[in-house]
Amino acid sequence: VNVADPTADPDAVSLYLQGVTMTSSTGAPCILGQSAGKLKLTCSGINTLTDTAAAANADTSGVIYGDCDITVTKNSTGTLNITSSMNTAIRSKDDIKLNGGNISINTDVDATSDADAIRANNTLEIDGASVTVTSSADGLKSSKEDVSILSGKGIPLILSSPHFINFFAYLDQLVKIHY
């Protein structure tokens, strides 16, 4: 993991993942963004992040967690595989934007798993990323604002979750789909 020069955007932390494999066996996030204005991830190659234990603090649980905006940048050309047996895969107390790369999330690991796949307190936007979600709980969740799926580029969004029945039943209220 390389940390970019913070002088380009002093409020942002940029991480470049190039063939990274990380496992958290303590419940702590593999990537933790605290006290930053933004956390920007750029992925190349195949990157795999996994957790195998529940977080001690449910408020900060997530394989990738930030109390700031989290963005997977449009410059991502690689794959980000996230497997979580106990915690939300990507969680932000602010916005989440998935703008590039191939993102595959599995939170439906075993019978005891009950973790959301992607959860933002504010806006959740997918625009330019190929996203595959298998979730034992909510697949895409925003607590306060919209979930936006912007399309038109032939980018697939594949969702599998017992909660998607409710998700799609309220599609006009929860999700803005732009073509």
Task: Report the location of each language-model feature.
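A composition-driven surface/loop motif
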Residues: 1-163, 167-172, 179
